[in-house]
Structures are given as C-alpha cells and as structure tokens.
Amino acid sequence: MKCNKKQEIIGENLMRDKIVLIDGHSILNRAFYGVPDLTNSEGLHTNAVYGFLNIMFKILDEEKPEYLTVTFDVHAPTFRHEMFADYKGTRKPMAEELRQQVPVIKDVLRAMHIEVIEKAGLEADDLLGTLSHRCEEKGMDVSIISGDRDTLQLATEHIKIRIPKTKQGKTEVEDYYAADVQERYGVTPKEFIDVKALMGDTADNIPGVPGV
C-alpha cells in the first residue's frame, strides 16, 4: 500500500520515505488474546480482526507512512524444520476461533489495498528481515510491528521495532532502535542473536546451552 503523502524538502535534505511492516500472525494472535470475544450475526469470531485493525490504525496514525505491508506465515514446513526436526514441536495448535479469522483479516487488508506477503518455506519474520534491510538500503525509515522480540535483532538507526501490548482492549507500544536494545538488554542487536541462541527458546522448542 502506498499512502497519499508527498515528500517534503526541509532545507537541503530530502525527507526519508517511511514504510510500516506488520507481522500479521503475531499481531493477530496478540489481538485475539487481548480483546474480549466478539462474534458477528453469523457466529463468526471477530475479536482478533477487530484488535488487529485497532493496532494497525493506531500505528498508521502515529507513523503516517508512505508504504504499508503485512506479512504472514504459511502453514507449511520451513528451512528450520530441515535443520531441526522438532522445531516448534511442542507448540499447541492454533485455537479454532483464531484460525477462522486469519483468512478474514487477509481479505480485509486486500480490500483496503494493503499489500499482503507470504511465502512457503519462510516465516513472516523472515520476510520482515529481508524487506526491512532492503528498504533501509534504499534510504527509507522502517517500522516493524511485531509481538516477537526475536525481531529486536533487526533494529538499527533507521529500523525501529514496535512491540504492541493489548490489555482490556487498550494498546500500548514499546519502541526499540539499536540503541534502545543496547540499553535494555546490554547487547547490540547482532549480539542479541547470540544471546537467544545460548538461552534457547521454549516457545519454539529450541534447546539452549545447558546451564545458561
């Protein structure tokens, strides 16, 4: 999606275009558990869709980007499963009330002419990583909206990670540039990768180094 906003010139410097990248499944999941159950007249659950759109509109109002893209996971094995067969092996199946809302939010986004990207063999955050760095290389400012703190490894001077939290229908957002990651965790974004590798990740069933 390209938003209707003209580039402006301040002094001799051309303002950088801005793109917002949203981790679709991550934000939909957070909205589902953060917003009370809602259904339409046909009995379709809509709380995740409602919460997702609230978060998205809040971010768009704050950021006023020229571009917006939403990435989604594809329900298929990824290259990580080839490297480690038990990857996400202990994760519970997605709640049916949430699953039925995934195609709905995609349809809503496409109806709004918002670009939706998904690719078999890759996860949404893989796409976020590629897109964010390519956009940065083209001189753009990037805001990544995700509930997954693994995305903190992507933070730079021009790539901001925004982690929303929804409680009782209200959304608050934590912002992280590279300097913020260093201040909060005592490591750089690149070093954050090593920390995660050493610690492991119970959510993804990835074992860490014993005793760490």
Regions found by a protein language model. Give the residues of each.
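Extended two-metal-dependent nuclease catalytic cores across DNA- and RNA-processing enzymes
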Residues: 10, 16-17, 36-39, 89-212
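Non-catalytic, usually N-terminal nucleic-acid engagement modules in DNA/RNA processing proteins
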Residues: 10-69, 73, 79-84
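Membrane-targeting and insertion segments and their boundary/processing signals
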Residues: 22, 26-30, 72-79, 83, ...
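A short beta-strand-to-loop transition that corresponds to the Sensor-1 phosphate-sensing loop
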Residues: 24-25, 71-74, 146-149, 165
